[in-house]
Structure formats: C-alpha cells, structure tokens
Design a protein with these regions (language model features):
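Short hydrophobic beta-strand element within catalytic cores of glycosyltransferases
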Residues: 292, 310-320, 651-654
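A charged, aromatic-enriched C-terminal amphipathic alpha-helix characteristic of glycosyltransferases
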Residues: 357-387
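Conserved donor-binding/catalytic core segment of Leloir-type glycosyltransferases
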Residues: 47-49, 209-231, 235-239, 251, ...
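Conserved acidic donor-binding segment of nucleotide-sugar-dependent glycosyltransferases
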Residues: 332-343, 351-357
Length: 660
C-alpha cells in the first residue's frame, strides 16, 4: 500500500492529474482482471502474463488484448494477469503460458519449472528489442536518464532477456525482431500487430465524424518520449513546409518535447496530451497526413507498422521511413509513401499537401488493405496453429470422487503413468475440494462442470459410469474414452434405478473408445454390448509390497491374524459374509482386522482392530502384519487385494469370480 501511495504522489507531481486518472483506470482494470483470474478457477487454454505496467498501455493492448481476441476468433480461450500477481496455483488452470515483456523473477522461475514438470509449454512475446542492452543502448533518450534510472532500466532489460532464454519459443511482431530473437530461442513466430473489433468500430465512427476544412493538418503521433530523435530527423522539412504553406497545421500527440525551432509556428501547432487509445482514432481522423519517421537503427527496424494501420483505418495517408515493418507492409505510392532521406520527405509532404486526390487515393487503398489483412478476426489462424503444434497432448481423467477405492487407484495410477510419458494430465471431479493430487508427483485437479472448464482437451477419459455423461457432453474434446473397470450395473440391487443408468453407458453408439483393465470385462462388453474394447492390463506396485523377508512363519503359539478388506456399505463387496464366517471361528485362535476406505464396521461384526482410510502407501504394512486375507466380494473385475497380499507373502481365501 505504501508503494502504491508513493506511485500516486510521484505521478501527480511529475505527470499531472490527467496522467494519474489514466493510470488509475488502467490499474483498476488490471486488478479486476487478476481478481477474476484468481477467483473463478476456470480451466482455459492460454494464460497471458503481462510484464508492462499501467504506464505502457499500448504494447499490452496489441500484444495481450488483441492476441487474446485473435485466439477467441479461432476457438482458443485465454485469461491474463500482471506478472507481479502471478500465483503458482495458476499453472494447473491453463494449457500454456505466454509471458509478454516480463522480466525474470524467482517466482516466475518457480512457475516455469512447475509448468515443465506438468509437460506444459511456455512462450515469450515481445514487440521491441528490449531483451539485451546491446539493442537498447541505441536509444538516445536513455542517455538523459540518471545513473539510478538507467541501471534500473538496463537491469530490467537483462532480466527480460534471461526469461526469454528460458522459454520454449517466442512470438513477435516483425521480421527484424524475429531475426534477433532467434539468437535467444530456437523458434520464433511473427504474429503482426492487428486491430481489434473495438478499434475497427471506433475508426468507423471517427470516419463518419470527419468534416471538410480549409487547412491541411499534419499529425505526428509519437506515443513515447523515446521518439524525440525520430521527429528531429524530419524537423527541417516540417519547418520548411510550415513556412511555405500557411494552411498547414501540425498536430503533436503524446510524450514529445516541442523543439524551440517550432515556437514561431505555435499558433498553428496543436499539442494534444497523451490520450486514451479509444480517443485516438478520432484524433488521427482530424489530420490529413500521418507522419511516421524512424531513424535508421536496428532498434527502430524492429518496430511494427502500428502507426500506419491506425491511420489507414480512418483513411489518413501515411508518410513513413523506408525501413523495417513499414518497408515490408507499405506499397510505396499505393498504400503509403516511403522515404529514405530528407529530400524524399520534403517531396512526399509537398505532394500530399498540394494534391488532395492523391491523399484520398492512398488513404483508400491503405484502408481497404488493412480492413482485409490487419484485423484480429482475419489473422488469428497462424497464432493458434503455432501454439497447438507446440503443445503436448493433454488428457483429462474424470473421477466420481477422490475417496480411495480400487477403481480410483487404478485411474490415478494411469494418470501418473501418462504424465511420466509426457502428457499434460489433469484430473477432474464434480465436487473436488483439492487443487492438486499427490506429493512427489503432483497432478492438477479441476472442477468438472461446464462453467469451470473452458479449454480444449486432446483426450478425456471417463473412469466410472457416472462420469461418462460429463465426457460426452463437454464439447471441446477430440477423443473420448471410457475406462470400464467393472460391471457397475450389479453394484446396485435389483429395483434400483441406477442399474439402468449404469448399464446404458456400455451401449453408447457414439464415438466412445472403450478401454478396460480386465479380460472378463472385455469379453462381456463384446458379447453383450457389441463394443470393441482395448485391453489395458493392470499391475501392482510390486516393490511396494514385496521384500526378501516376506516369508511367513506361522507360530502356533500366537493367534492367526485374518484381514477382511472392503466397504461394507456396498452390497456387492459382500463383507457381511466374511464376518459370518469369522463368527464361526474360535476367538482364541484367530484375531480379526478389518480395513475399509469408507464405511465403518456394523455393530455385530467381530473386529479386534479397525483400520479406516489407511493411506495407500501404508497398506503394504497392514498386509505384512496379517496372515490371511479373506475376500468374499461377489463382483470383481480385477481384484488388487489378493495380489497385494500374496506379494507380501500372505495367504488368500477368496470367492471365485471374474476378478479373482
């Protein structure tokens, strides 16, 4: 709060009330976006992490807001957050991350390491050569900074370069930027700046408000004080035409120092303060000629063609330096005029001042081109295609709950295996209360409903009958799978309506890929439902249960310890029969342990020790302490407890069924 107060005071003192108002609005907007991102917990495709503060709104608008709009037009969802408010938990809520002009921080380093652990890709976006002081040293304005300010600026530049090198690839706005960025990362996409829908609407509105006038207005919309040298380059020409043509007026917009040489024309100079971008189209539309000079430096060659596009959308012709993006995008004498020296600048200005038809001809051609090729809805495919090509396949495994059972453990094991194989794996549950599953190997957990999922999935896997509906109904899934682990119809007694609901999941005709962990399940799925089903064999964590000291030595002087395992609340587990058998045994010879993940023992059960919700990693110790496992469940597709008991050296008494 103290830091925020200091910024308010400094802005008010140095830049005035209008700047404070503008930055306050930007700050509030940014915080609202971040609050939404933290609170809504919605899974989306892309998170843009913005490294520019409220003092630089225009780069953020083009490289974050407009690129987000491009993605939306082509089916990818996104959110944004200011880099200082990035939280580690956000890594589970997105497929990929785009850092825009962000400096390296320890928090971001931790975030990227976690993203790599989860097989998620990280990109860097930058629209200026602010990644190495080799480039920024070419900005003359920086030499006017104090030593303290310059050090802070240079440190920030170096940290941006450091973060860039950590990313998988980069996205940028111009060819020269692409060339330089390839020195830092192996692959760089050029995604040129585009105009948003709102920009288009505001530009059309500004066009309708245009009025005829007797003056010829020239505009220089610098945007930044670092462009002082660019304007000074054409200053002699400006002075000459303003001296000769009395009808010429000069509009200066943004952070620019007015040269003393222009003071004699101050009655024909209109100075506009830095304006909100929404007012810029109307302001540009007031002029007849747009000036876009750039001194010939590598830093300037990397700059985008924004100023040309903004002017073209309100049918104002541009005279620009013949370098960088201007040279690439403007067709000389057709959609603009390109200049290489002062003489050409003079000729271009004279031509457009004297020839209104030429102004209209160039302006119309530029307008038509930019409407066709420079709008977000027209230019999103390459960005979406680039991101999708780089992303690892992602997989959503849908669970009914996280209550431990054999079926849940199987699904979780497959999730771990697929993550180790390089998949971007997430778990989903309707009533998930946790954000992460696992300790040593963490897997993101998401809420499974339409309001909380808004991203694409390559594969989604239903794990129990109750989860198939979610997988079928969520639209953004390329491949739908159903991991059948039992004949769940018989989980319910005759007359229960859930029997029908479970049974119909085995008869889905649509494009569901059936998988199973049991040959028994594979057979009845084919025979009774006509489903071709892939067999995914189960296994146990053998090393967790087996060791060289597992051989039992039954001591006749001690009681034989019998373990009963299963949920007595599920009738098909048939735990009651186990305890009916126990009641026939001699109490003096047999000690009874009962292990359940859910229900507690019934009053009539004879239990010497009750083991409730034992963590899976501790289960082997329970088996090792017991001599015999008694398993009377009537329905098993692949029964883990008998295998695990045998692996620890114990004996098993079980009902013969498909799983035993």
């Amino acid at each position: 709060m103290e830091e925020l107060f200091e910024k308010v005071v400094r802005t008010l003192k140095d830049e005035g009330l209008s700047a404070l108002s503008r930055k306050t609005k930007s700050y509030i907007k940014t915080r609202n976006i971040e609050k939404q991102a933290k609170n809504n917990q919605v899974f989306r495709d892309v998170l843009f992490i913005n490294g520019c503060g409220e003092e630089l709104p225009h780069p953020t608008r083009y490289r974050v807001t407009h690129q987000r709009e491009q993605l939306e037009y082509y089916g990818m969802t996104s959110s944004e957050v200011f880099f200082k408010h990035l939280s580690l938990d956000m890594v589970r809520l997105y497929r990929t991350f785009v850092f825009f002009r962000c400096p390296y921080t320890e928090e971001i380093n931790e975030f990227i390491l976690k993203a790599r652990e989860l097989n998620k890709k990280v990109f860097y976006d930058v629209d200026d050569l602010v990644i190495d002081t080799e480039y920024t040293d070419q900005i003359p304005y920086l030499d006017t900074m104090s030593m303290e300010e310059r050090k802070a600026y240079d440190d920030n530049v170096r940290n941006m370069g450091k973060l860039l090198k950590m990313c998988d690839a980069a996205i940028t706005s111009t060819t020269h930027l692409q060339i330089e960025l390839k020195k830092f990362v192996p692959e760089v996409l050029i995604n040129r700046n585009t105009a948003s829908e709102e920009m288009g609407c505001l530009s059309e509105k500004a066009l309708r408000l245009k009025k005829s006038k007797s003056t010829v207005d020239i505009g220089y919309f610098s945007g930044s004080i670092t462009h002082n040298d660019d304007f000074e380059m054409i200053l002699p020409v400006i002075i000459e035409v303003m001296t000769f043509y009395q009808e010429v007026r000069l509009h200066l917009v943004g952070e620019l120092d007015l040269p003393p040489e222009l003071l004699e024309f101050q009655n024909r100079i209109i100075i506009h303060p830095f304006v909100d971008w929404k007012k810029l189209p109307e302001l540009i539309a007031e002029v007849d000629i747009n000036l876009a000079p750039l001194t010939d430096t590598l830093f300037n060659k990397a700059k985008s063609e924004n100023k040309w596009v903004e002017a073209a959308l309100v049918k104002v012709p541009t005279i620009a330096s013949d370098l960088g993006a201007f040279k690439e995008k403007i067709v000389n004498e057709k959609t603009g005029i390109l200049c290489t020296d002062i003489g050409e600048w003079k000729n271009a200005l004279i031509t457009l001042i004297e020839n209104s038809d030429k102004r209209k001809e160039i302006a119309e051609a530029a307008y038509q081109y930019c409407k066709q090729y420079c709008m977000t809805y027209k230019k999103g495919f390459e960005l979406v295609d680039f991101l999708r090509k780089h992303l690892k396949k992602n997989m959503l495994i849908v669970l009914p709950s996280f209550e431990i059972s054999g079926g849940i453990m199987v699904a979780l094991t497959h999730a771990k295996i697929m993550q180790k194989r390089g998949y971007d794996v997430s778990l989903a549950c309707i009533n998930a209360k946790i954000h992460w599953y696992g300790d040593n190997q963490q897997i993101p957990v998401l809420l499974m409903n339409d309001k909380m999922l808004d991203g694409e999935w390559d594969i989604a896997v239903a794990t129990m009958w109750s989860t198939l509906k979610n997988v079928i109904e969520y639209p953004k899934i390329k491949k739908r799978c159903y991991l059948v682990q039992n004949y769940e119809t018989d989980f319910y007694q005759i007359g229960d309506p859930l029997r029908r609901k479970a049974n119909e999941t085995y008869a889905v005709v649509s494009s569901i890929n059936y998988l199973t962990i049991s040959k028994w399940c594979q057979n009845w799925l084919k025979k009774e439902f006509g489903q071709e089903c892939k067999y995914v064999p189960n296994g146990i964590e053998y090393n967790q249960f087996y060791n060289n000291h597992n051989e039992r030595k039954f001591d006749r002087k001690k009681k034989i310890r019998i373990l009963i395992e299963g949920d007595c609340g599920s009738y098909y587990k048939n735990v009651d029969e186990s305890f009916k058998i126990i009641n026939e045994l001699d109490k003096d010879k047999y000690e009874i342990w009962y292990m359940s993940y859910n229900a507690e023992p019934k009053e009539w059960y004879r239990v010497d020790r009750f083991l409730h919700k034992i963590p899976y990693e501790k289960v082997a110790e329970v088996y090792q302490e017991c001599d015999i496992l008694l398993k009377t469940s009537i329905l098993e597709s692949f029964s883990y407890p008998p295998l695990e008991m045998m692996a620890t050296g114990g004996m098993v008494v079980a009902v013969p069924n498909g799983g035993n």
